[in-house]
Design a protein with these regions (language model features):
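Conserved MFS/SLC helix-loop-helix module at the cytosolic interface between two early adjacent transmembrane helices
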Residues: 71-107
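Helix-breaking motifs and short loop linkers at transmembrane-helix boundaries and internal kinks
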Residues: 50-52, 84, 105-110, 171-172, ...
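12-transmembrane solute porter fold
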Residues: 19-36, 40-42, 55, 59-64, ...
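Paired small-residue
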Residues: 95, 99-102, 110-118, 369-377
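Membrane-interface helix termini in secondary transporters
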Residues: 46, 74-78, 82, 166, ...
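Cytoplasmic helix-loop-helix junction between adjacent transmembrane helices
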Residues: 118-151
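Helix-loop-helix hairpin linking two adjacent transmembrane segments in secondary transporters
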Residues: 156-189, 206-215, 221-242
Length: 495
């Protein structure tokens, strides 16, 4: 199978209806979901007061979203392959709206956690959207469209911080969630009206046992990573969760290999192009998130520390915003490079650009414009990598497995960001400096995290070098040749 995608209209056949609106609608949906993930950042420090709970308890408002997203992303991808990607996209957007309403109505901890968990269930929107593109767009348009949808993750994250800070500064904090609900309704209606349903279906029975096993293993793993610093990395709880994750995921893997219709086809996942791309995704995810962990903190620390810039949260968000716009602007460039040289080369170039951006930031971190420049360079690299990874995945899996495969790749990136958060937390907690009666993360600690981001990007580059290279022209021809057979299979399974 190929990344070119098998919905090119044949001579004498009309193109699918409404495809001109598909890309902007799916990009908007991706932006709305990524905005949701940054909503609570401006009010994290005030949540204990708002919800009448301790800081450790209110941290679950973030952890619940992470865990729900980890479980929902692969599950929704598989359900999309089976029952319709547009249908599961609508379900995901509905979960975002419901979760936003629940959080918007909450004044205590439990409803907030429930609402944030429901919001996390929408995280499969971007991989589902990319999978829809494969089914609906002709091959020549797929690369740029995929890069744009992938970039929507960065755009939403970069624009979400200043937007959320602006809302939190001028309105009641519940307005953050009502804004999310309103945007979710708009995106849901646009998807319902303008995005066609794919005919590519696998049918069959859903692997409920496999979903439960994967969910259990992922929850144990991510819970240990995200809460290990609070509980202690050597505590029985943390070590027990890591051990449970290893045992559960190994057992899950053996089970999936013996099931006729597994949640994740591990034989497909073990193909070199898929496996190596997913490994590179973990490293790239680590590299991407390091920027988000360091730059806002450095911008907001008091100038009296000697290295902080004393900016407000809103100003810090505005500094980060251009990086998201750079990601979107370079999406077509990423697609052109992939078409000319292949997505493997695009991924490697992107990883090098990310590493260069971090190297630049290690040297330049004393002026606001230094951070604007560094974040834009890093954003450019992320735009290249995030456009290339789905193309590599789709180039190696059947169209009937696109949703599950893209969702697994998204999950790998999320694991990378979770590990980055944990590692940065440890580094910044250990490398502190005294500021009055407070211990603040020191300048050397921030430089170390930036250097780790560069190192992770270079590791991603090295891993990507081992991805088997397949000529783009051959892949495109192969996909077009297989399109009729796949569409027949999809129609038959639907019937």
């Amino acid at each position: 199978m190929s990344d070119a995608l098998d919905r090119s209209p044949t001579p004498g056949t009309a193109a699918p209806p409404k495809t001109g609106a598909v890309v902007p609608v799916l990009a908007l949906s991706g932006i709305v979901v990524s905005l949701m993930q940054t909503l609570v950042i401006p009010i994290v420090g005030q949540l204990p007061q708002y919800l009448n709970a301790s800081a450790s308890d209110t941290a679950w408002a973030i952890t619940a979203t992470l865990l729900a997203a980890a479980v929902a992303t692969p599950v929704m991808g598989r359900l999309g392959d089976m029952y319709g990607k547009r249908r599961m996209l609508l379900v995901s957007m509905a979960m975002l709206v419901v979760g936003s309403v629940v959080a918007g109505l909450s004044d205590s901890l439990v409803p907030m956690i429930v609402g944030r968990a429901l919001q996390g269930l929408s995280s499969g929107v971007i991989p589902l959207g990319i999978s829809i593109l494969r089914d609906e767009l002709p091959a020549e348009k797929l690369g740029s469209a995929t890069a744009m949808i992938s970039a929507s993750l960065g755009v939403g994250g970069a624009l979400g911080l200043p937007a959320a800070a602006l809302i939190a500064d001028n309105f009641d904090w519940h307005a953050l969630f009502w804004t999310s609900a309103a945007l979710g309704v708009v995106a849901l209606l646009l998807v319902a009206v303008l995005v066609p349903e794919s005919k590519v279906r696998t049918g069959g029975r859903f692997d409920l046992a496999g979903a439960a096993g994967m969910a259990t293993g992922l929850v144990c793993l991510l819970l240990a990573i995200s809460k290990g610093a609070d509980w202690g990395w050597g505590s029985g709880t943390t070590l027990g969760l890591f051990a449970a994750a290893v045992v559960t995921l190994l057992a899950w893997g053996f089970f999936e290999l013996r099931v006729d219709q597994p949640l994740v086809d591990l034989r497909t996942t073990a193909r070199p192009q898929v496996l190596i791309t997913n490994l590179a995704s973990v490293a790239i995810g680590f590299g991407m998130f390091s920027m988000s962990l360091v730059i806002p903190q450095l911008l907001q620390l008091p100038e009296r520390t000697g290295y902080g810039l004393g900016q407000s949260l809103l100003a810090a968000g505005l500094v980060m915003a251009p990086s998201g716009l750079v990601m979107m602007a370079l999406a077509p460039v990423s697609a052109l490079v992939s078409r000319a040289k292949g997505p493997k080369v695009t991924l490697m170039i992107g990883a090098l650009i990310v590493a260069a951006g971090y190297g630049l930031n290690v040297l330049l971190m004393s002026e606001v414009w230094h951070f604007v420049l560094a974040s834009c360079v890093i954003g450019a690299g992320i735009g290249f990598t995030y456009g290339a990874m789905p193309a590599l995945i789709m180039g190696a899996v059947p169209a009937s497995e696109t949703g599950a495969a893209n969702s697994l790749n998204t999950l790998m990136r999320s694991i990378g960001t979770s590990v980055a958060s944990a590692v940065a937390g440890v580094v910044l907690a250990q490398m502190t400096t005294r500021f009055g009666s407070y211990a603040l993360p020191g300048e050397d600690g921030f430089r170390t995290v930036l250097a780790l981001g560069a190192g992770a990007a270079l590791i991603g580059f090295a891993i990507a070098a081992f991805i088997p290279r397949r000529p783009a022209a051959a892949a495109d021809a192969h996909a077009v040749a297989e399109a009729p057979a796949e569409e027949s299979t999809g129609v038959a399974s639907k019937a």
